[in-house]
Amino acid sequence: VECGDETKADKYEDMMLDVIDEGYHYIVASSTFRDVMLKLAKEYPENQFIIVDDSMDEADIPDNVALIFYAQNEGSYIVGQLAAGMSESGVVAVNVGMDTPVIADFVTGFIDGAQAYDPDIKIVKAAVGSWTDPAKMKELCLTQARDKQADVFYQVAGASGAGLFEACKELGTWAIGVDSDQYAYYKESENPELADIILTSMLKNVGDSVVAFFEKVENGEAEWGK
């Protein structure tokens, strides 16, 4: 197993080519890498590629590619209810890195959950336009608090989400994390005070699903091309 952590989009392909050249057969990456993964799947038909947290038309999926996707709307529904229940202003915010079909599913679930708890709740939503711009995210949240009175914030924004936590700490408002236990992460970080404003995190347990997929590979039950 080799892990790569390249964050520059123009370096994604080089990173994957490196591991292919080193003899790795299975390549696993998130939906951020979809275009590169599909390109390499055609160029390296003997390799197999697993794209995590993505969905697309089955007709467009090569035979050596598998997708793992989730019902993120369901977890977001629950934290939407939590956000509405904790809000004192009656305004909650959901801020994302970029608008994609998967992210839209997060947002829809959050909105549905908040409105199920309180039909009169107001919801503001914005996209930073990047997964790696915490400064812009922080400014966005501060503006939403000032202009819209938002007082509970949910982030689905990758590394940009750090700016939401910083804003909530400054504002004294609640934040909700995603994908990992961000309370635990910040509690052990150089900024443990950020943990104090995190209500909870919406987890999809991506790691568990990848392990489960490879158990199917080992048993000859994995499905490719879908």
Language-model regions, residue ranges each:
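A residue-level marker of the well-folded mature domains of exported/periplasmic proteins
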Residues: 1-226
